[in-house]
Amino acid sequence: SCSRKGPKFVEYKYMAGSAQYCEHKNMKFMIGSNFIDFDDCTRCTCYNHGLQCCGIGANAGVFGVPGCEAVNDHCELVFLKKNTDQLCFIN
């Protein structure tokens, strides 16, 4: 799933007008920039219309595998046999 936040503006000090940017966790990003937030497992892009962040890996969407449970392993979705530490699938 994705979330969106509107753009932010800051007035220029010496020129007329304002600069537009996006803000995420108290950090400012230029329009056109993108980044991955591994704490939230999201990929974010700063557009003119604001910041869009979409889930990746473990937060990309929910689906089930019979007999297994999904576990978040640093934004990678891993399926373990229920009540064990054994992988359901080995690549």
From Swiss-Prot:
Annotated compartments: Secreted
This protein's record includes keyword Secreted: yes
Keywords assigned by UniProt, alphabetized: Behavior, Disulfide bond, Pheromone, Secreted
Gene3D superfamilies: Beta-microseminoprotein (PSP94) domain
Cysteines engaged in disulfide bonds, as pairs: 2-54, 22-46, 41-75, 44-53, 68-88
Gene Ontology molecular-function annotations: pheromone activity
GO cellular component: extracellular region
Tissues expressing this chain: Expressed in ciliated epithelium of nidamental gland and in secretory-like cells in accessory nidamental gland (at protein level). Expressed in ovary, nidamental gland and accessory nidamental gland.
Lineage, broadest ranks: Eukaryota, Metazoa, Spiralia, Lophotrochozoa, Mollusca
Family: Belongs to the beta-microseminoprotein family.
Species per Swiss-Prot/TrEMBL record: Doryteuthis pealeii
Functional note: Acts as a pheromone. Triggers aggressive behaviors in males such as fin beating, lunging and grabbing. These behaviors form part of the competition for fertile females.
Protein name in UniProt: Beta-microseminoprotein
